[in-house]
Amino acid sequence: MFNYSGLNEECGVFGIWNHPEAAQLTYMGLHSLQHRGQEGAGIVVSDQNELKGERGLGLLTEAIKDDQMERLKGYQHAIGHVRYATSGNKGIENIQPLLYHFYDMSVGICHNGNLINAKSLRQNLEKQGAIFHSSSDTEVIMHLIRRSKAPTFEEALKESLRKIKGGFTFAILTKDALYGAVDPNAIRPLVVGKMKDGTYILASETCAIDVLGAEFVQDIHAGEYVVINDKGITVKSYTHHTTTAISAMEYIYFARPDSTIAGKNVHAVRKASGKMLAQESPVKADMVIGVPNSSLSAASGYAEEIGLPYEMGLVKNQYVARTFIQPTQELREQGVRVKLSAVKDIVDGKNIILVDDSIVRGTTIRRIVKMLKDSGANKVHVRIASPEFMFPSFYGIDVSTTAELISASKSPEEIKDYIGADSLAYLSVDGLIESIGLDYDAPYSGLCVESFTGDYPAGLYDYEANYKAHLSHRQKQYISKNKHYFDSEGNLNV
């Protein structure tokens, strides 16, 4: 099976302007975004004269140590990044923010997401003489900015943003301003907050604003960029060719439950999805349990709707990184054994409804079902609070091949047998859309559900040929039976 090259990320970005402890607050903000990436972190700081940065591999506490933080003190502006990346792209050179020193200015830049035309842009830039120092998509936009003929940095940024495709947010720092930008579909979230002293904050999630005691100001919407400087804050559009398609996986899995995306609290959405799942797929049992942590809200909703007790049948070791975003399959499988254990006294002899947020590869849920049955569970009915994860994601989630997706080749009945469950049911696409409750005048009410439908709102670009060449029979069947709203370049099909 062909493996798509490229750097698929699910990361967290943070920025702050005009605070005497900018680096320290950035560190705190990144700590609240640690769930978005555990393989590296970095901070770039700025004042009126210079930019400097520190970065490292591992969790934030491993990547940026006390002596590094000391070197970042005394600066008023900062951006920061926590990173997840596919294996093979884990070197220090790819840890963000990337920092560039040019003859006329210095720039720090970091991003969350994936640029689906980065490969072709990179090839064209190299033909023009560009030299790349990392394999990160982020470096592509820096080359585009520097090669622009636009008269100002802001104009060059706007011009460059129009050339890149995919799901992304950027945080960019110069000595003059802090910039943030969101893709034309708002697939990846970016929010603005304000502290009591007037300091502005940029972050991937509202939880990073809340942790600093700041107030939420606004979401940055599809095709918008924000400029924060000593004059204040300005939000502008760099393109009017926009269709809102916020990643459903942000609500389902990635975001913290205390975050709010497009006005919808993540915990409330997950609980609503559990209730909807119970309405769509009830089953007789003694109790409901959830897979910690991202499934607990949905499990509580399912239990409440069906009128069963919600029990803690699984306990998680909170100090083990999340398995879905571990870079290799071997590490993911080892991680399940280390991080979860069944509570035997709770599950022994019981018929259990096990709620999980998604089935991607199937390995994790298979081990959990076995763990519960080994601990004495009589029956385990699996309920998934999202639709079948049938199609690759190219917008910033590390699932970019059909071969990785169990639902691409197996039916729910076949997956039920594979994971050893007594029954298996998924939330419908319509049920997911209703549970999240967005009301944009856009396909899927403003959600990006590409992994469940094969409908890609930002298009496919560099991935198109190989994606189409490796569609499974089951994927082709789904596509032939269901309406698609977007073409391969992300244009709306009229």
From Swiss-Prot:
- What's its catalytic activity? 5-phospho-beta-D-ribosylamine + L-glutamate + diphosphate = 5-phospho-alpha-D-ribose 1-diphosphate + L-glutamine + H2O
Under which main EC class is this enzyme filed? transferase
Q: Which residues bind Mg(2+)?
A: 294, 356-357
InterPro entries for this protein: GATase_2_dom, Ntn_hydrolases_N, PRibTrfase_dom, PRTase-like, PurF, PurF_N
Q: Which residues participate directly in catalysis?
A: 11 (nucleophile)
What UniProt keywords are attached to this protein's entry? Glutamine amidotransferase, Glycosyltransferase, Magnesium, Metal-binding, Purine biosynthesis, Transferase
Keyword hit for Glycosyltransferase: yes
EC numbers? 2.4.2.14
The cofactor remark states: Binds 1 Mg(2+) ion per subunit.
Record pathway:
Purine metabolism; IMP biosynthesis via de novo pathway; N(1)-(5-phospho-D-ribosyl)glycinamide from 5-phospho-alpha-D-ribose 1-diphosphate: step 1/2
Family annotation (SUPFAM superfamilies): N-terminal nucleophile aminohydrolases (Ntn hydrolases), PRTase-like
Q: Which residues form the propeptide?
A: 1-10
Any one biological process term the GO annotation gives = 'de novo' IMP biosynthetic process
> Which prosthetic group or cofactor does it need?
Mg(2+)
Kindly list the GO molecular function terms attached to this UniProt entry: amidophosphoribosyltransferase activity; magnesium ion binding
Chain ranges of the Glutamine amidotransferase type-2 domain: 11-231
What the record says about family reads: In the C-terminal section; belongs to the purine/pyrimidine phosphoribosyltransferase family.
Function in brief = Catalyzes the formation of phosphoribosylamine from phosphoribosylpyrophosphate (PRPP) and glutamine.
**What protein name applies here?**
Amidophosphoribosyltransferase
**Per the UniProt entry, what species is this protein from, by scientific name?**
Staphylococcus aureus (strain MRSA252)
